[in-house]
Design a protein with these regions (language model features):
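Transmembrane alpha-helical segments that form core, pore/gating elements
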Residues: 34, 42, 57, 150-210, ...
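Helix-helix packing/entry segments at the starts of transmembrane helices
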Residues: 104-110, 177-193, 229-260
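Hydrophobic/small/kink-forming positions within alpha-helical transmembrane segments
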Residues: 23-31, 58, 82-90, 112-117, ...
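Membrane-interface helix-cap regions at the ends of transmembrane helices
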Residues: 4-6, 54-74, 139-152, 194-214, ...
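Transmembrane alpha-helices of multi-pass small-molecule transport proteins
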Residues: 14, 39-87, 166-169, 189-205
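C-terminal transmembrane-helix exit sites in multi-pass transporters
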Residues: 92-94, 111-133, 253-272
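Loop-to-transmembrane-helix transition segments
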Residues: 14-22, 61, 65-91, 155-163, ...
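Hydrophobic transmembrane alpha-helices of multi-pass small-molecule transport proteins
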Residues: 130-146, 270-289
Length: 305
């Protein structure tokens, strides 16, 4: 095997390992948030998550030494993006108060369908019939999980879908900002906006935890989320997004296991069937995205010859 090919293979495998680590952090974060919801307001949990994530870089290093950390060419878009992420987190954590982990994450995985549908009007990346079909099938999976009109339907499922929509809009604005602002700058604004926005509200809903474990988990939420995002960024520096994206779906396995171990939750047949449809449709979307990008890259090479 040529040295360059060997180096690329090692980089990709390392990137995949980092991606799996990031996904594990996000699964642990959702589990921790659901557990903390038993002892305090969702607003307090979300505030702890963003405040901890903002302070975490100061513990492991001095972020102010990084030149241009706060410099952004699009401050309004940074604010919009940060508010979208905050709204997504609030809706997700609120849904976790009522839904099982596996149900909530299955609905959150509808995010790629929202992204694909919104990329046309917002980014000019129009979706063709194959991907529209995958989107439609994916939402059938969402309906299987939520079962609207059935006895098993819980209104909190709408919170999970709202979280997915907000996260899709957040992802699209992130792609726009990536053209001008660094990852570190974008992370900085996400965390500080979330922490400051909830600060005036938190005193009115504050509950002082008496259990040392609850205090430790409350402090840890920010570190877990922040570390997960750093692993995610590191993974994308080592391997292409098309290689890494399918591993996002390992989170549903992790949260199902954690839901059973921590809360004794057993997924029902509707959640399992719906999750399988959602994951299958999402993987097909990734396959089509990879194929379309490959065709574009090939055409670009030919035109440059």
């Amino acid at each position: 095997m040529p040295p360059d090919a060997s180096h690329e293979r090692v980089s990709r495998l390392t990137g995949i390992a980092l991606m799996c680590g990031a996904v594990a952090c996000f699964a642990l974060l959702d589990t921790t948030a659901k557990y903390l919801n038993l002892y305090m307001s969702t607003l307090q949990v979300v505030w702890a998550r963003y405040t901890g994530a903002f302070l975490f870089p100061f513990i492991v290093s001095n972020p102010w030494t990084r030149p241009g950390l706060t410099r952004t060419t699009r401050p309004l878009l940074q604010l919009v993006r940060s508010v979208l992420l905050l709204a997504s987190t609030l809706c997700n954590f609120a849904a976790l108060r009522y839904l099982q982990l596996d149900e909530a994450i299955a609905l959150i995985f509808s995010t790629p369908f929202f992204v694909a549908a919104l990329s046309g009007p917002m980014l000019g990346e129009w979706v063709r019939w194959r991907r529209w079909t995958a989107i439609a099938v994916g939402f059938v999976g969402v309906l299987v999980v939520t079962r609207p009109g059935a006895a098993g339907f819980h209104p909190a499922a709408l919170l999970s879908l709202t979280a997915a929509l907000c996260y899709a809009l957040y992802s699209i604005t992130t792609r726009i900002l990536a053209r001008t602002d660094s990852n570190e700058t974008t992370l900085f604004y996400s965390n500080i906006v979330g922490a400051l926005a909830l600060l005036p509200v938190v005193p009115f809903v504050w509950t002082t935890p008496g259990d040392p474990l609850v205090i430790a988990l409350m402090v840890a939420t920010g570190a877990i989320g922040s570390f997960g995002h750093y692993l995610l960024i590191a993974a994308h520096r080592l391997a292409p997004a098309a290689v890494l994206s399918p591993f996002i779906y390992t989170e549903i396995v992790l949260v199902t296991a954690l839901g059973f171990l921590v809360f004794g939750d057993v997924p029902n047949r509707f959640t399992l069937a719906g999750a399988a449809i959602v994951v299958g449709s999402g993987l097909y979307l990734l396959h089509r995205e990879r194929k379309v990008r490959g065709t574009i890259d090939q055409a670009s090479k030919v035109s440059n010859q």
